[in-house]
A protein has these predicted regions:
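Extracytoplasmic small-molecule ligand-binding "clamshell" domains
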Residues: 20-98, 107, 251
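Ligand-binding clefts/hinges and TM-proximal coupling segments of bilobed small-molecule sensing domains
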Residues: 22, 151-166, 206-207, 237-266
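Short helix-initiation/N-cap motifs at beta->coil->alpha
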Residues: 59-60, 74-85, 132, 166-180, ...
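Periplasmic-binding protein-like
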Residues: 116-124, 190, 194-237, 255-266
């Protein structure tokens, strides 16, 4: 875990290139912060289909950031496939939906300190007899689905040796492939695996027996805007120190994947 977080520091520093800046000034002048979210991210930035209300840790933290800035918040629907374009083309001031810090994304985006760290998990069906344990996944004839643009796509492309990788255009597509039996498993993370177990009657979790691939999650913004990045980092430092961040993590049952830096040292 410490090695992962140490590597994050190098990646985020490398992401601080030159680009258009001035988001802090714009936010304060407009009295509004535009926050990109992925509204299907259970426990993170989820639009509840029953209420149509947004809920999750990063919804709570986005609203807290807006209060800290004394501005309104406007949520902008995005996705992992759209993430880089939405941020770099200024459709939002910041993306707040537990974004995995990867080398590919860090070439284009500037990340904050991580607040969550998740391993990779697999979802299969309760009726699938081929997949019983994690060791059954990378075998000849097994089809592993991942969603385009997610961090799981490059990771599984690199790690799989015998199984067939199926990349779907949407996250719903990977679920449909598994539920229909066309794929054996789809790869996801801790928050989304909870959604599958709590909201479907067919999903079964397959967890790695040991650490497989930890990824730190953070918020992302344009490169080259140091005042904005520093202001958000100050908010996160304050939210960590006063316990607000950890309270939000626990409220949404994400404490198993809380980053060590999310807990107050007081």
């Amino acid at each position: 875990m410490r090695r992962v977080l140490a590597a994050v520091g190098l990646i985020t520093m490398a992401g601080a290139g030159q680009a258009a800046g001035g988001h802090l000034e714009r936010v304060l002048a407009a009295r509004e912060i535009r926050v990109c979210i992925w509204p299907d991210y259970y426990g993170i930035s989820y639009r509840n289909p029953k209420t149509q209300q947004l809920e999750g840790i990063d919804i709570d933290m986005a609203r807290a950031l807006a209060r800290d800035l004394n501005v309104a918040v406007r949520f902008v629907d995005s996705s992992f496939a759209q993430l880089i374009g939405d941020v770099t083309q200024d459709r939002c001031d910041i993306a707040m939906f537990a974004i995995g810090i990867t080398p590919q994304r860090s070439e284009k985006l500037h990340f904050t300190r991580p607040h969550l760290v998740s391993d990779i998990y697999a979802i299969t069906t309760k009726s699938n007899r081929r997949i019983r344990t994690w060791d059954d996944i990378d075998k000849p004839g097994v089809v592993v689905a991942v969603a385009k643009g997610t961090l799981h796509e490059p990771i599984m492309r690199d790690k799989l040796r015998q199984a067939t990788l199926l990349v779907t255009d949407t996250t719903q597509g990977r679920e449909q492939e598994v539920e229909s039996g066309r794929a054996d498993v789809f790869m996801t993370d801790f928050p989304f695996s909870r959604r599958m177990l709590e909201t479907t009657d067919w999903a079964r979790l397959v967890a790695p027996a040991a650490t497989y691939h930890l990824t730190p999650y953070a918020y992302a913004m344009q490169q080259g805007d140091s005042p904005w990045h520093e202001r958000v980092e100050q908010f996160l430092a304050d939210a960590t120190r006063d316990g607000q961040l950890m309270a939000a993590i626990r409220r949404h049952k994400l404490d198993p994947i809380a980053a060590p830096t999310s807990a107050s040292k007081n």
